[in-house]
Every structure is written in structure tokens, then in C-alpha cells.
UniProtKB/Swiss-Prot annotation:
Keyword Transmembrane: no
Gene: lepA
EC number: 3.6.5.n1
Lipid bilayer topology: Peripheral membrane protein
Localization per record: Cell inner membrane
Source species: Herminiimonas arsenicoxydans
Key words of the record: Cell inner membrane, Cell membrane, GTP-binding, Hydrolase, Membrane, Nucleotide-binding, Protein biosynthesis
Catalytic activity: GTP + H2O = GDP + phosphate + H(+)
Entry protein name: Elongation factor 4
One Pfam family recorded for the sequence: LepA_C
Sequence intervals crossing the membrane: none
InterPro entries on file: EF-4, EFG_III/V, EFG_V-like, EFTu-like_2, G_TR_CS, LepA_C_sf, LepA_CTD, LepA_IV
CDD domains in UniProt: EF4_III, LepA, lepA_C
Binding sites annotated in the UniProt record for GTP: D14, H15, G16, K17, S18, T19, N131, K132, I133, D134
Cellular component terms (Gene Ontology): plasma membrane
């Protein structure tokens, strides 16, 4: 066991995490040059394309060190994005060490800091590595100073390497072996194994990626999952070197996979503890929690006959994405669809994109909303994740909205514009500190404001230099109202939005004027109104198309013209009573892209 090292790589998007992993795998001979491809561990097309890691992957490698010993290195790849922070914390708790990869030309960024603090909290040894030192604008001393300033770990002997050229990668592994402690654990104790990740394979069912903490596991033994309590027979176990290799046993300190014929991912939750049914462990490993969706949106098929296909696609995605929640929903305007819960905006985009790309779906998405807690007049509490479910204002005692703590990191020249943005989004400043060139701002902000377009705005005000991460803090009473859109005095449920009262008139007017541009002219006048309860806050009219009925009267008597005009007017009035307005699909999307001028 002394020659095992379990480690993961912490890095901001684009600081070269996956490339470094590729180099390490190549150096250890995990794959022949023929099988080597860019970003071996990012197996989803979407992961490669966006350059992000969504699911954790592993590689068990053997490395002959300079001291002549052969070490087993287990690399556990972690996602780097805020939305997947729970998956990161599970990956990190399976390790004893982490390589903190920092781009020598850019310095420390928000996600790195968030994940690094998480690693330090879990007691993981952090080894700083400066990557991309081959770039002409690389500045290693400044980057080291920044690591010490912002994160507060000693970076004087940080390893310098370039994952692209392969320079210094061996030094990284040597530093890893020297600094990271071997795993602790007792191979003879009752089995405890942490599920780091699990995914669904079409041939064998659920594959669980586990870190064995104590005990030993062999095939044909019965295992019990502690959170869900299900008992299954182990069919095969092994390691990924990055291709899978079966083994006769897995013992304490090792990272490998278990296949036990589990049919659904719900049974094998990330963070759960695996133990033997015959000789169970006394208690589960700490840190397991159920993942709660934070952001909700409705997904509707463009063609009504695709509803079943959409349900099947969501089911298949759910097999590989335990954080995705969905339930059927009916909207008068959009027909049948699903209300889906996501971890955050990136997660939502990825799910949408995978549905469109892997399953050929055409989707309409309603505006993302967060979960509000509503206290009713009789004291009962309900959770509202959909504007159309919001009760009548007269029955509501108070509405509480989710507040998050946002950590923002940016170069100091952008502080002013970022603060202005945060104030516009109803943020309350909690803290501000300078670290070298970088500034860290801490704000409390309503989740609803972040969900809308905060991230894009942040990137544009700071020219892409600012980075952020956020975590849920609490529910707080707030003056939010539901704005309904009426078209010819009929409510359209899919257009309802929940906004803060101070912003409601503005948003109502904005949506109404956007709708006016998008609803085609009819043969009768169409009135578009935004209302809060019974108060109408804004109105736009789409003028009717009309035939020139006076074209055939040359000169002639005014009463004749009047008669024709009155007749036309009566006809239009009658049409307005029976006619219905078709709302084009773009109109629903317009609610999403509300650009604040």
C-alpha cells in the first residue's frame, strides 16, 4: 500500500488539466501511441467540444520513479465547474493528494480557488504545478506569488511544466510521489468503499467507480449500498488503465470499478458507501448528501408527437446523470412537456444540448426559474418551481427566495464595473480583499438574478477575466411578484415570470414590447398586456391589417364612406370575439433573451 498514490487534478477551465492528464497517461504507458488521443478522459463529445469535464473518470497507472521503485498512481479526473461541485467533493475525498494546476500566464481563477479550498477542507495534500511555461507571456514568479496570496499555500517549490510539449511532466510525478501520503486503510477490516461516480452501460448495467477505504472485495460476493439499502451480487471488478482491466480483487487504497448488475442509477448514488452484505461496516463514510436541483425550466417538444420520444431521451440521460430531475407538465400554450430540475445553468445547457445532439430533439425551453418558498395565509409552506403554480397574491403571507453567496475574482481594473453589475442584480457586498493583482469580492445575491444572465453579463463587463462560483445560503423573505402576460385578455401560462417588484414594471414593459414585434399582425387588433394580480402595468397593441374599403368610392357622399367604414369596424369587432391568436415559437424564446439596455 505504501506505493499507491491517489490524486486528482484541480484546474480552472482551459488551464490545461486534460492535456496534463494525457501526458501523465502517456508517460506511464497507459495507452499505446496508437490509442492516444487528445483528452482521453473526456469521453463525451460535448466535454471535448466545450473543453470541460462533466463526469469523473479515472486512470490507474504504473510509474517507475527515479528511486527505482514502481508506484501505482490512481488519477481521478474531476469536473471543474461550479454546477458540479458535489461531484468534485466526492472525487477529492477519494484522494490523498491533488495537483493544483495554474496557468503560468494567467494566474489563479475562481473555480480553482473554490475547488482548492474544498480540497484543503477535506485534508487533501495540494501540490502546486505551473503549466504552460512554454508560452512567451508566462510569468512563473507572479503566478507563484498569486498562489501564495490567494490560496495561502507555499508555492516556492512549485513544479514548472508544459503539458503541451511534455516538458517537466516527470518532475510533476516525482513531486507527487514525494509530497502526497500513501492511503491509510485496513485491508482486513469490513469493506467500506466510496462511490466516486457511477454511470450506465448498455451491456452490463450500472458501473460504479469506487475508492476502497477499508477491506477487500472479490467477485461473486454480495454487496450492500448503505444509502439505498439495495443488495446486489458482484459480477466483476477491476481498474481502468484508462481501458478497463478485470482484477481478482480490490483492496484498501485502490480505485477501481464494480459491476453488480444494478439496473438503475438511482440505486448507486455518488457519495454512497459500498459494504459487504455478509459483514457490513458499522457506519457509512461521511459526506454523502442527496443532490438538490437549484434551477427549473420546462422542456417542451416543438412537435406534439415527439412527447414520447422526449420522455425516452430524458430517461436515458437520467441513467447517466443522477442530478437531473423531471416530471410531466402541461401548458395551455405549449402542450405536453416536462418540468426539469438542474444543478445550475451550465448543467441545463448541457442537458438541452445533449437532447438536441444525441437524441435529435427539437425543444422549446421556458425561462429558468428557481424554487421559491411561499408561506400561505393559513401558515402552510409550499415550494413553487413554476410561475404558473404561484397562488393568488391575496392568499400569500410572504414569499421567500433563495439567496446565494457569490465569490467573484477579477483583475483590479474591472472591480468598479463588476460592483455596479452586482448592485443592479440586488447584491449585498459582504467582503472585498486584494491579493496581488487579483481582487476577491464576496456578495450575497438572489439566485434568481444569477440564473437569468448574470454569468454572461459578468464575462462581458470584465472582458472575460472575472470568474465566479456560488453556493446556496438560505431562503429569505423578499418582495417578488408574478407578472402575467395577457393576449387579448387571455392569460398565457408559459409567458408568466416571477420578478422582484422593483424590476417588475420594467420587465413587464420589456416583454410586452418584445411580444409586439414577434406576434404577426392579425385581421383584428391584438392587445398585449402585462399584469400583476389585477393591475395592468403595461399594454401594447398589434394593429389590425385592413382592406381599404373606400377604394371604390370616387368623390361621392361622406355618408356612403361612413357606412362602409362602420361595416368594416363591425366585422373586425366580431372577428376579435371569436378569433384566436397563434403565438409563434420565437415569442417564448424572447422571454429568455431579455437584453437589459
Amino acid at each position: 500500500m505504501n506505493n499507491i498514490r491517489n490524486f486528482s487534478i484541480i484546474a480552472h477551465i482551459d488551464h490545461g488539466k486534460s492535456t496534463l492528464a494525457d501526458r501523465i497517461i502517456q508517460l506511464c504507458g497507459g495507452l499505446s501511441d496508437r490509442e492516444m488521443e487528445a483528452q482521453v478522459l473526456d469521453s463525451m463529445d460535448l466535454e471535448r467540444e466545450r473543453g470541460i469535464t462533466i463526469k469523473a473518470q479515472t486512470a490507474a497507472l504504473t510509474y517507475k520513479a527515479r528511486d527505482g521503485q514502481v508506484y501505482n498512481l490512481n488519477l481521478i479526473d474531476t469536473p471543474g465547474h461550479v454546477d458540479f461541485s458535489y461531484e468534485v467533493s466526492r472525487s477529492l475525498s477519494a484522494c490523498e493528494g491533488a495537483l493544483l494546476v495554474v496557468d503560468a500566464s494567467q494566474g489563479v481563477e475562481a473555480q480553482t480557488v473554490a475547488n482548492c479550498y474544498m480540497a484543503l477542507d477535506l485534508g487533501v495534500e495540494v501540490v502546486p504545478v505551473l503549466n504552460k511555461i512554454d508560452l512567451p507571456n508566462a510569468d512563473p514568479p507572479a503566478a507563484m506569488a498569486e498562489i501564495e496570496d490567494v490560496i495561502g499555500i507555499d508555492a516556492t517549490d512549485a513544479v514548472q511544466c508544459s503539458a503541451k510539449t511534455g516538458l517537466g511532466v516527470a518532475d510533476v510525478l516525482e513531486a507527487l510521489i514525494a509530497k502526497v501520503p500513501p492511503p491509510k486503510g485496513d485491508p482486513d477490516a469490513p469493506l467500506q468503499a466510496l462511490i466516486v461516480d457511477s454511470w450506465f452501460d448498455n451491456y452490463v448495467g450500472v458501473v460504479m467507480l469506487v475508492r476502497v477505504v477499508n477491506g477487500t472485495l472479490k467477485p461473486k460476493e454480495k454487496i450492500r449500498l448503505m444509502a439505498s439499502g439495495s443488495v446486489n451480487l458482484v459480477e466483476s471488478i477491476g481498474i481502468f488503465a484508462p481501458r478497463s482491466v478485470s482484477l481478482p480483487s480490490l483492496s484498501a487504497g485502490q480505485v477501481g470499478f464494480i459491476i453488480a448488475g444494478i439496473k438503475e442509477l438511482k440505486a448507486a448514488k455518488v457519495g454512497d458507501t459500498v459494504t459487504l452484505a455478509s459483514r457490513p461496516a458499522a457506519e457509512a463514510l461521511p459526506g454523502f448528501k442527496e443532490v438538490q436541483p437549484q434551477v427549473f425550466a420546462g422542456l417542451f417538444p416543438v412537435e406534439a408527437n415527439q412527447y414520447d420520444a422526449l420522455r425516452d431521451s430524458l430517461e436515458k440521460l437520467k441513467l447517466n446523470d443522477a442530478a437531473l430531475m423531471y416530471e410531466p407538465e402541461v401548458s395551455q400554450a405549449l402542450g405536453f412537456g416536462f418540468r426539469c430540475g438542474f444543478l445550475g445553468l451550465l448543467h441545463m445547457e448541457i442537458v438541452q444540448e445533449r437532447l438536441e445532439r444525441e437524441f435529435d430533439m427539437d425543444l422549446i425551453t421556458t425561462a429558468p426559474t428557481v424554487v421559491y418558498e411561499v408561506i400561505m395565509g393559513d401558515g402552510s409552506l409550499i415550494k413553487v418551481d413554476n410561475p404558473s403554480k404561484m397562488p393568488e397574491p391575496s392568499k400569500i403571507e410572504e414569499i421567500r427566495e433563495p439567496i446565494v453567496t457569490v465569490n467573484l475574482y477579477m483583475p483590479q481594473e474591472y472591480v468598479g464595473s463588476v460592483i455596479t453589475l452586482c448592485i443592479a442584480k440586488r447584491g449585498i457586498q459582504m467582503d472585498m480583499s486584494y491579493h496581488g493583482r487579483q481582487v476577491k469580492l464576496v456578495y450575497e445575491m438572489p439566485m434568481a438574478e444569477i440564473v437569468l444572465d448574470f454569468f454572461d453579463k459578468l464575462k462581458s463587463t470584465s472582458r472575460g477575466y472575472a470568474s465566479m462560483d456560488y453556493e446556496f445560503k438560505e431562503y429569505r423573505a423578499s418582495d417578488v411578484v408574478k407578472v402575467d402576460m395577457l393576449i387579448n385578455s387571455e392569460k398565457v401560462d408559459a409567458l408568466a415570470i416571477i420578478v422582484h417588484r422593483s424590476n417588475s414594471q420594467y420587465r413587464g414593459r420589456q416583454v410586452a414590447s418584445k411580444m409586439r414585434e414577434l406576434i404577426p399582425r392579425q385581421m383584428f387588433d391584438v392587445a398585449i398586456q402585462a399584469t400583476i394580480g389585477a393591475n395592468i402595468i403595461s399594454r401594447e397593441n398589434v394593429k389590425a391589417l385592413r382592406k381599404n374599403v373606400l377604394a371604390k368610392c370616387y368623390g361621392g357622399d361622406i355618408s356612403r364612406k361612413k357606412k362602409l367604414l362602420e361595416k368594416q369596424k363591425a366585422g373586425k369587432k366580431r372577428m376579435k370575439q371569436v378569433g384566436s391568436v397563434e403565438i409563434p415559437q420565437e415569442a417564448f424564446l424572447a422571454i429568455l433573451q431579455v437584453d437589459d439596455k
